[in-house]
Amino acid sequence: MSVLALDVARDVAAPRRAEILETLRALADGADATTREIASDDDADALERASCDAYFARARDASEARRACARASEKLRAGGALGVVVDDERTATATTEAMVLAGFTTVTREDDGVVRCVKPNWARGTAFALKSRAVRVNATAADAADAWGASAAADDDELIDESALLTELDVNTAPVKYDDCDVGAGKKACKNCTCGRAEAEAAEEATTAASEETFVSACGNCALGDAFRCAGCPYLGQPAFKDQPGTKVELDLGDDL
């Protein structure tokens, strides 16, 4: 046999309470059930948890709506129905929000001023396994080798021969690498140079000397020192001179007095 709980506010006068009870019983649609009236906290405590198939209450404001939803959530069985009779729009909105926050589902508002909902068919703390991608913590060496092999096979399709990118001009003008001479901190030609570094240094010195002899200053500040020389000046790093390179400027330290 079904158990119906009728929640009536304890501060309602007796005639009004009887009217509310008739309204709540009418919501049960005449079902053959045992009716339990809840008019106080003691009545609510006497009712066992999850023992009701339906719970009906009347709410005059938001606080009564929240109290009714809290009691119904405790006393209703899974799948049980809750119906709350409201008087105005504000209370109806508050009741709807209270039902949702209490975890009820299928919240509907009827034209007769009753807000109905259903207690979900699961219990608190119910576990549910979610499908997720399994993480392989202990992968075998064979799996790792297969992964690297697949990666290498994919890379082979996109490899380009680097030699094919060089033109004939690039090959002919490639710099000569000298491997036989390594003296001191810097590389220079050794005494018995056989790798060609000595000849390259001699040719570079001759080229530098020839450029200095034929050099014509564009700014006219080459003799003044690095502070006045341009970025491409061949005399960068050399001391200031008078007219010809190599002629150092000497300061007269004599006493004029």
From Swiss-Prot:
Binding-site positions, [4Fe-4S] cluster: 219, 222, 230, 233
Keyword Thylakoid attributed: no
One GO cellular component, as annotated: mitochondrial intermembrane space
Signal peptide positions on this chain: none
UniProt region (N-terminal SAM-like domain), positions on chain: 1-132
Primary location group: cytoplasm
Alphabetized UniProt keyword annotations: 2Fe-2S, 4Fe-4S, Cytoplasm, Iron, Iron-sulfur, Metal-binding, Mitochondrion
Residues spanned by motif Cx2C motif 2: 230-233
Record keyword Transcription present: no
Renumbered ranges of motif Cx2C motif 1: 219-222
UniProt-annotated stretches for the region Fe-S binding site B: 219-233
The protein's role, per its UniProt record: Component of the cytosolic iron-sulfur (Fe-S) protein assembly (CIA) machinery. Required for the maturation of extramitochondrial Fe-S proteins. Part of an electron transfer chain functioning in an early step of cytosolic Fe-S biogenesis, facilitating the de novo assembly of a [4Fe-4S] cluster on the cytosolic Fe-S scaffold complex. Electrons are transferred from NADPH via a FAD- and FMN-containing diflavin oxidoreductase.
Subunit structure: Monomer.
UniProt remark on domains: The C-terminal domain binds 2 Fe-S clusters but is otherwise mostly in an intrinsically disordered conformation. The N-terminal domain has structural similarity with S-adenosyl-L-methionine-dependent methyltransferases, but does not bind S-adenosyl-L-methionine. It is required for correct assembly of the 2 Fe-S clusters.
Family classification: Belongs to the anamorsin family.
Protein's name in the database: Anamorsin homolog
Source species: Ostreococcus lucimarinus (strain CCE9901)
